[in-house]
């Protein structure tokens, strides 16, 4: 359980296809647009966590190389779609993942894993390199800008 002021590590997947489009989804909890992301579990590395989170949230297994896009600092207020009751700082580890598999243009996946998201239906689509970032909260916008610069 998160303690007040305790830093929580997160891993964020920036999966791009051959066109440079980025995999994003609409979160049904608040209708915001997001990237696959989640908490690094005890004993887990951010590298392992980003692969697990992508699989849990999208159903996509990614075994390819990870390219670090650095980290982002974020303060997470209590409440919201993350289901936290305690405000806390977060450190997001961002990874670029280049898909070599053909994936559908749009698809839905029922999330597994965390109690807050288990059973939620996420609607995925690909975000074009020049698409506006309306609907994304600031940390996701920052992650997308980094991913776009690296592609």
Locate each region found by the language model.
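N-terminal strand-loop-strand
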Residues: 1-35
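A short, polar/proline- and glycine-enriched secondary-structure boundary/capping micro-motif
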Residues: 33-37, 116-118
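Active-site-adjacent beta-strand/loop module that shapes the phosphate/pyrophosphate-binding cleft
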Residues: 74-111, 125, 130, 143-148
């Amino acid at each position: 359980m998160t303690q007040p002021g305790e830093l929580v590590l997160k891993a964020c997947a920036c999966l791009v296809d051959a066109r440079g489009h980025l995999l994003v989804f609409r979160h049904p909890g608040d209708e915001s647009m997001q990237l696959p992301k989640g908490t690094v579990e005890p004993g887990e590395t951010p590298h392992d966590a980003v692969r697990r989170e992508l699989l849990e949230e999208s159903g996509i297994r990614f075994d390819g190389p990870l390219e670090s896009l650095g980290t982002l600092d974020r303060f997470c207020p209590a409440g919201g779609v993350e289901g936290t009751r305690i405000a806390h700082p977060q450190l997001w580890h961002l990874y670029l993942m280049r898909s070599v598999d053909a994936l559908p243009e749009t698809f839905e996946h029922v999330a597994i894993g965390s109690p807050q998201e288990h059973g939620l239906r996420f609607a995925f689509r690909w975000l074009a390199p020049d698409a506006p970032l309306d609907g994304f909260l600031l940390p996701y916008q920052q992650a997308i800008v980094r991913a776009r610069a690296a592609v």
